[in-house]
Swiss-Prot record:
Subunit architecture: Homodimer.
GO cellular component, one term: plasma membrane
Keywords for this protein: ATP-binding, Cell inner membrane, Cell membrane, Membrane, Nucleotide-binding, Sugar transport, Translocase, Transmembrane, Transmembrane helix, Transport
Membrane-topology annotation of the record: Multi-pass membrane protein
All residue ranges annotated as the ABC transporter domain in the record: 335-569
PROSITE patterns: ABC_TM1F, ABC_TRANSPORTER_1, ABC_TRANSPORTER_2, NDVA
Subcellular location: Cell inner membrane
Primary localisation category: membrane
GO molecular function list: ABC-type beta-glucan transporter activity; ABC-type oligopeptide transporter activity; ATP binding; ATP hydrolysis activity
Gene name of the record: ndvA
Protein name as catalogued: Beta-(1-->2)glucan export ATP-binding/permease protein NdvA
Stretches assigned to coiled coil: none
């Protein structure tokens, strides 16, 4: 995207407050035209002094004009500041809403820190450009448009000096833009790397300290800052050179105007006041040209980050689903995978030709070694990814033909990572159901064996859990996540190692709760516990992305196939009595898979 198109697109965001924007633009244009009269009035003051005539009236008019101009500029600048800040926050809110609504694959491809950094830096740059446009850019272009014919009317020979000056500014700016284009893109790249490293290190500060990586992480940051400075220094040098060349050109131009003006005064072709007026025009033009140079500097330095933002914005619009997609009606929970294949880009991993059917209310245990495709299968159901071949249906409806919002309403997921916000316990659980009553909240936490430990906290349900639940134990975090899913009361429940962080006693209670809420509800469990697999209606055994075996627990045992051999390698006794003591003894299937 060219610099001009980038600039126009940035300004297009001001259309959201069109009336205020047009009012400020009109005031700016008026000010720009009126500003040109100031050197003319000052020239008249000089002429009245030279003629020894009454200067009081002319001087008073000039002073009043100058003061009024200052007041008007302050009012316009105030309005521009407010409008720019309002628009910045509006763009931030709308972009944020689009970003968090994107599929998870979109975020995984870009990275959280990259999207955050792009959004914040771009909105800051847009705010600066809006401010400069409403304060200076528009009035500068208008002033130059009016100033050129006025100066030519006064004295075309002196005007040529100013035209040469303008051409020099343009040539210098063009040269610097060409020299810094690639450098500015590199600067933005290193900015992202720097921000990514800081975010990554701070978010994993416990690992950094545990493995005594403070010196190494600081050294790596130092390398990132050196890379940034190495890329930024040449860019800054070029703009410093441009500033010096512009200043030299403007000084030479003023000297030429004064010398030529003095020559014309001696010849009687100009008065002293007219020369002063023309010098004022020269200074006004130099000031406007300096503003244009500053604007070009701002636009060029912002282009790379704005281009990234626009690419991100465009990708959100392209990824957006059609507005007229229907919703899932009265979900019962019958799910079917129809020859589903998904392969990760630039990888041979994924899932391949998966077909199975789950009746409404059944519990499905997904089993397999690490990297077998268990989580990928669940992600396809949640439309984190869309199949490259085949499709998935809920109650006979292709989930690609419905809107994502209704699909998400039908699913309640408990991940291995509880995923808590830095908010209160109440807020974190209430995410499951907006507007839930206290009674519903308490019932959910009691079912998840969370109510008792919550009451022991300093502020009970109003206790802050810290960033990602850092103020809670692993088991406490997991129970809150389960309570959140219980509160949502969705017809389809997904548990990704949901009880892996719990002690045996708590796991028994939570397992009973899960068994309770699984009644009349389709449940998918990524299973690593033998007790979970035994109780499932359907067991899916995956390996290397393929569905190797499926059936009930006993059916797979009777097959004497891969699943049975896996259990046997783990040294587990299959035909032991299913007493409560034995059934609730948590035997890690993961151990068998590792053998």
């Amino acid at each position: 995207m060219s610099l001009f198109r980038t600039y126009v697109r940035v300004l297009s965001y001001l259309n959201q407050e069109k009336n205020a924007f047009l009012l400020i633009c009109t005031a700016n244009i008026t000010l720009a035209i009126i500003t040109i009269a100031e050197p003319i009035l000052f020239g008249h003051v000089i002429d009245t002094i030279a003629d020894k005539s009454d200067t009081l009236v002319t001087l008073a008019v000039w002073m009043c004009f100058g003061i009024s101009n200052i007041i008007a500029y302050v009012l316009v600048a105030r309005g521009a500041d407010r409008l720019a800040h309002r628009c910045r926050l509006t763009v931030l809110e709308k972009s944020f809403a689009r970003i968090i609504s994107m599929p998870l694959i979109w975020h995984q491809q870009r990275g959280t820190s990259h999207a955050l950094h792009t959004l914040l830096r771009a909105t800051d740059s847009m705010s600066s450009i809006w401010l400069e446009f409403m304060r200076q850019h528009l009035s500068t272009f208008v002033a130059l448009f009016v100033l050129v014919p006025v100066t030519f009317k006064m004295n075309w020979r002196l005007s040529i000096v100013l035209m040469v000056l303008a051409i020099l500014y343009i040539l210098i700016a063009r040269l610097v833009m060409q020299k810094t284009k690639n450098g500015q893109a590199a600067v933005e790249h290193y900015h992202h790397n720097l921000f990514k490293h800081i975010t990554d290190s701070i978010s994993n500060v416990s690992i950094v300290q545990s493995y005594n990586r403070i010196t190494e992480e600081t050294s790596a940051l130092h390398q990132h800052t050196n890379n940034l400075l190495s890329a930024q220094t040449p860019v800054l040098n070029w703009w410093a050179l441009a500033s010096g060349l512009n200043r030299m050109a403007s000084t030479i131009s003023i000297v030429c105007v004064l010398l030529l003006g003095a020559f014309f005064v001696i010849k009687g072709q100009l008065s002293v006041g007219e020369v002063v007026t023309f010098v004022g025009f020269s200074q006004l033009m130099i000031g406007r040209l300096d503003q244009i140079s500053g604007f070009i500097n701002l636009a060029v330095s912002s282009q790379a980050k704005l281009q990234e933002f626009f690419d991100m914005e465009d990708s959100t619009f392209q990824t957006n689903e059609p507005a007229n997609l229907p919703s899932l009606p009265n979900v019962k929970g019958a799910i079917q995978f129809h020859h589903v294949t998904y392969e990760f880009p630039n990888s041979s991993q994924g899932v391949f030709d998966i077909s199975f059917e789950v009746k409404a209310g059944q519990t499905v245990a997904i089993v397999g070694p690490t990297g077998a495709g268990k989580t990928t299968l669940i992600n396809l159901l949640q439309r984190v990814y869309d199949p490259t071949v085949g499709y998935i249906s809920i109650d006979g409806i292709n989930i690609n033909s419905i809107n994502r919002e209704s699909l998400r309403k039908a699913l309640a997921t408990v991940f291995q990572d509880a995923g808590l916000f830095d908010r209160t316990i109440r807020d974190n659980i209430s995410i499951g159901k907006t507007g839930a009553t206290d009674e519903e909240l308490y019932e959910a936490t009691k079912t998840a064996s969370a109510h008792d430990f919550i009451l022991k906290k300093s502020k009970n349900y109003d206790t802050l859990v810290g960033e990602r639940g850092s103020q809670l134990s692993g088991g406490e975090r997991q129970r809150l996540a389960i309570a959140r899913a219980i509160l949502k009361n969705a017809p389809i429940l997904i548990l990704d190692e949901a009880t892996s962080a719990l002690d045996v006693e708590t796991e028994i209670r939570v397992k009973n709760a899960i068994d309770c809420i699984s009644q009349n509800r389709t449940t998918f469990i990524i299973a690593h516990r033998l007790s979970t697999i035994r109780n499932a209606d359907l067991v899916l055994f995956l390996d290397q992305g393929r569905l190797i075996e499926k059936g009930s627990f006993q059916e797979l045992i009777n097959k004497d196939g891969h699943f049975y051999k896996l259990l046997k390698r783990g040294g587990l006794t299959i035909n032991q009595p299913a007493t409560k003591e034995k059934d609730d003894n948590i035997i890690p299937l993961r151990k068998a898979m590792a053998l």
